Regions:
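Conserved SAM/SAH cofactor-binding pocket of Class I
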Residues: 46-130
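Short beta->alpha hinge that forms the Motif I/post-I loop of the SAM-binding pocket
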Residues: 90-92, 140, 163
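Conserved class I S-adenosyl-L-methionine
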Residues: 163-180
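N-terminal auxiliary segments of SAM/dcSAM-dependent transferases
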Residues: 1-25, 36, 40, 212-213
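Conserved beta-strand signature within the Rossmann-like core of class I S-adenosyl-L-methionine
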Residues: 155-162
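Conserved SAM-binding loop and adjacent beta-strand
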Residues: 34-52
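A short glycine-rich, Lys/Arg-flanked "PGG" loop and its adjoining helix->strand segment in the class I
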Residues: 142-154
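Core SAM-dependent methyltransferase catalytic element
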Residues: 189-213
């Protein structure tokens, strides 16, 4: 049923929460997840690869977790950058409720969990970390990235993790073709069948970006 997709705004299934224990930003934590969201049993492999690949986030400003699910990326950003404002953005209201609950449980005050339309249009980001919802379909995914990638601040980076057999390299080519002048996209790393793509807004670039083939 479409209502059961993790990218649905309001999952139709009865809420069934669970507690998982995991490690985020060097902290052993106990978090709440639920059915009707992405990877409720554990931190999925793609997100693990992303979190192991990215450098420390900027210490301040607005940071974005695009397609946040129950919140492992957003919570990591908030733990590593306690003086920043972390936007956890998802269409799934159940996922956003879980992000809020987990942030409260961990006494994290600097996360704003919001649907896309509730992020003010004038907010721009010092970094974007995302395990994007590939299964929404190519057109929806492209529309999503075309909306949010341009909200990156000059000289700042977006980090996307995509499974290779779900089109990471074709997405890389699309990003290069869609943002040929303003952004530089490269393959930053490859691990466990996933690519981590890095996109830097060209204005303010201070050096070369490495590439992994």
């Amino acid at each position: 049923m479409a209502s059961e997709h993790y990218f649905s705004a309001s999952p139709g299934s009865e809420l069934k929460t669970r507690t998982i224990r995991t490690r985020l930003a060097g902290h052993e934590v106990e978090l709440t997840t639920a059915n009707g969201v992405f990877s409720p049993e554990r931190i999925d492999t793609g997100t693990q690869v992303l979190l192991a690949s990215v450098p420390a986030p900027p210490p301040g400003g607005n940071l974005l977790d695009l397609g946040c699910g129950w919140g492992p990326i957003a919570l990591t950003l908030a733990l590593e950058s306690p003086h920043a404002t972390v936007w956890a953005v998802d269409v799934n209201e159940r996922a956003l409720d879980l992000v809020r609950a987990n942030a409260e449980k961990m006494s994290i005050p600097n996360i704003k969990a919001a649907t896309p339309e509730n992020v003010p249009e004038d907010v721009t980001f010092m970094t974007i970390w995302s395990n994007p919802p590939i299964r929404v379909g190519k057109n929806e995914l492209h529309n999503l990235l075309e909306k949010w990638i341009p909200r990156l601040e000059p000289g700042c980076d977006a980090w996307l993790v995509v499974q290779r057999n779900l089109g990471s390299d074709s997405l890389h080519r699309w990003l290069q073709a869609t943002f040929p002048d303003e952004f530089a996209f490269v393959r930053a790393s490859t691990n466990k069948g996933y690519r981590v793509l890095r996109g830097r807004r060209r204005s303010g670039m201070t050096g070369p970006i490495g590439i992994v083939r």
